Amino acid sequence: MVALSVEVGPWTGCAVLFLRSCPAVNLLSLYKDQQGKFSVFKVLKLTLTDSAGGLEGYEILKLHDADPLLGVEVKFVDVAACRRFLQSYGSGAVQQSLSQHTCRLLHIPQQELALETQLKAGTHTLDFCLDDLELCLQHIHQSQPERLRDDEIAELDQQLQSQALGHIPQPPTLTQEEPPVPSNCFLFQKRVFEDRMLAAGDLQRFSNGVGRDWRKVGRALGKNCRALKGPAIDNLAYEYEREGLYEQAYQLLSRFIQAEGRAARLGRLVRALEDSKLTSLAENILDIQPRD
C-alpha cells in the first residue's frame, strides 16, 4: 500500500542535500561571496538537471548555511523526478555530476576536490535507507515545504535562464567556460568521451596496467561505492594475495561493476585513476596515444 500511496494524486515533498567540499574550494564560503554565488547555484542546478532527468518536477527553495555544510533545500512536485533523483543519489551519480560541474565551472583540478554528501527529509537521514526507495519517497512526501522559494534563489534562477538564452554575458569574475559536456559524456584532458558502461576490455587493461596501485584506485572508487568502503579492499588483498596483483586488481574492478550495475561507468574509473595520479593508465584505457 505504501508504494501506491506515493503515486496517486498531487505529489509534493521536500528534501535537503547537504554538501561539504574541500580542500580546493569551500562551496559554502563561495556561495556567501557575491562573486561566487551564481557559480555555485549553476553547479547545483546542473547537477539536479542531470540527476532528476530534466528541468521539470522540482525546484530549489533555499540554500542554507549549515556551517561547515551547504544545505540545498529541494521541493519535488513530481514523484517520477524524485525517484530518478534518489536512484542517481544512491548510485553515486549525483556526487559524480556535482564533482564534474564544480571542477568545470570553477576550474579546479579533479584530484584537488573532495566532496561529502548527506540527504535528509525532515528528521530522517535517507543515506541509511537508500536500499528501500519507497520508504525514501514516503519520508520526502511527509516532509512538506515550510516556505516559498527564497527571493535570492528566484533571482539566481532568472539570471541562469537569461544566460542560457544569451541575454547576459558570463560574469566577468570567472574565466569563460567551455561548452557544457552532455550528461552522457565526461571530460578528460579537454576531450569529450562517451560515459559508457565498463566493458571486459576495460577490466583487462586496468588489471594489466595498475600494478601495486590497485588499492589506491580502489579507495578512490570507494568514495562513491559502498561495496568498496571499510575493510573491503584489505579483504580483497588478503583473499587473492596468492593469485598476485593482476587478480587482485581484476577482482576489485569486478566487484565495483557488480555492485554499481549500470552506474559502473567509464568516467568514474577515469576519475579514480586521475585521483590516484595514474593518468597514463587512463590514457591507455581510452586509447589515447601518449604525448612525446
UniProtKB/Swiss-Prot annotation:
Subcellular location(s) of the protein: Nucleus; Cytoplasm; Cytoplasm, Cytoskeleton
Main location: nucleus
Pfam families xref list: Death, TRADD_N
Transmembrane regions: none
Gene Ontology BP term (one): positive regulation of canonical NF-kappaB signal transduction
Keyword terms: Apoptosis, Cytoplasm, Cytoskeleton, Nucleus
Span(s) of short sequence motif Nuclear export signal: 148-164
Subunit structure: Heterodimer with tnfrsf1a.
Function: Adapter molecule for tnfrsf1a that specifically associates with the cytoplasmic domain of activated tnfrsf1a mediating its interaction with fadd.
Protein name (database record): Tumor necrosis factor receptor type 1-associated DEATH domain protein
Species: Oncorhynchus mykiss (Rainbow trout)
Encoding gene, per UniProt annotation: tradd
